Amino acid sequence: MKYVALKDVCKINMGQSPDSSSYNENGEGIPFFQGNADFGERYPVTRVWCNAPTKIAQSEDILISVRAPIGALNYAKEKCCIGRGLAAITPDKSKVSLEFVYWFLKGKNAELKSKGTGSTFKAI
């Protein structure tokens, strides 16, 4: 078996919070997810939109919580803006499948949580 770094088979896009003046609850712009509080069983639930996104995840990207609680996962069901509490992982499908990466990360949840640092809340 050959082990490779995640960054060698996936693009990792760390979230960034857009200006709060671009947030809205009336559907203008694209869905905005700040962290795993927006996560559903498989896909996030849209409550807030953003009309000036800074970091974007594409449909079928894996969304991972990078702030407490670390490691929660969802799939992006559409193009969306991601805040500082999330990262989007885009597998290079010529190297690895989306499902493999999702379940691999799910299996590494305890290890990811153990890597968290911070006194107020854990983050990776």
Functional labels for PLM-detected ranges:
Residues L105-I124:
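Specificity-determining recognition surfaces
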Residues K2, E28-P31, I62:
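A generic secondary-structure signal marking the coil-to-beta-strand transition
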Residues P18-N36:
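Short beta-strand/loop turn elements enriched in aromatics
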Residues K2, S97, F121:
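Hydrophobic (often cysteine-bearing) scaffold residues that line and stabilize catalytic clefts
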Residues Q34-N36, Y43-K108:
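A short beta-sheet element
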Residues M1-S17:
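Non-catalytic DNA-recognition/assembly elements of restriction-modification systems
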Residues P31, C80, K122:
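Residues that recognize and position ribonucleotide moieties
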